[in-house]
Amino acid sequence: MAYDLKKESDVKEYVEKLGVEYRFGCYSEKKPEACHLLGDYLEGIKKDFEKASKVYKSTCDDYGYAKSCYKYGNYSFLGKGKSGSKGNPQVAYEYYEKGCNLNDSDACLHSGLLLVSKSMPREIDWNVPKGLEFLTKSCDLNNATACFYLSGMHISGVQKKADQSAVTASSGSGTSSPPAGQPPLKDSDYIVLKDMKKAFQFAHKACELRNMYACANLSQMYARGDGIEKNEKEAEKYKKLALEMQDEVKKQHDTLGFQQGVGMPN
């Protein structure tokens, strides 16, 4: 049957049919992709977050479907789908880690961020080396945001002191200095050393993966000669690219976060 998606009645019928197809694919044919799409349907179309949460959880637990593990991690962190819940960061981390082990780049990104950022909940222990592993894996899986965060970490370094912020996803390149009156920091004071060459490499990859902030950083690195030989032509090239991306973002409209199980962005 052909649908005229300009007609409200046809749209409603089409959407209802989608739900039937996803339920059949999930519960009768036992297809994990269909189960995940059912979760997206319940979330995006029906706005039934409680049922969506249950579907994502079971699809992760029963089938090891990576994107569902990531989605349930998000639900757990936010307390979404559970009335009155404030969220459970520890459960969220468990599902992010499971999703990362199943090679979902977003799950690796969130696993890493929970471990390296001091702004995260107390339930999660600060563990920069392990967090760095997760972020590196995410970047290796071509997650632009992870590559950008890794670049920021190497721009400023990560100090051992517990009261220092771990992740510095800088909007501009450069290095930080100790407060006036304090002795300069030594290499032994850092968990992750400042390394502008590595910062450049991660920024370059993030920019190639269309992270506009990384492209802006790359422009500044070329302009200053940070981590790479100074090159005004390249600096202008990446500045122009970052501005083009900024314009693209402004033109984008909110879209339904649907079919995330088959590679759609969140």
From Swiss-Prot:
The lineage of its organism: Eukaryota, Metazoa, Ecdysozoa, Arthropoda, Hexapoda. This is Cytochrome c oxidase assembly factor 7 homolog. The keyword Repeat applies. Sel1-like repeats lie at residues 32-64, 66-104, 212-247. The keyword Repeat applies. Residues 166-179 have a biased composition (Low complexity). Keywords: Repeat. One of its GO terms (molecular function) is protein-disulfide reductase activity. Gene3D superfamilies: Tetratricopeptide repeat domain. SMART domains: SEL1. Required for locomotion. Probably involved in the regulation of formation/maintenance of motor neurons at presynaptic terminals at the neuromuscular junction. Residues 166-187 are annotated as: Disordered. Disruption phenotype: Knockdown in the nervous system results in reduced lifespan, mobility deficit and shortened synaptic branches of motor neurons. Transmembrane segments: none annotated. It holds the Pfam family Sel1. InterPro entries: HcpB-like (IPR040239), Sel1-like (IPR006597), TPR-like_helical_dom_sf (IPR011990). It comes from Drosophila melanogaster (Fruit fly). GO terms for cellular component: mitochondrial intermembrane space.
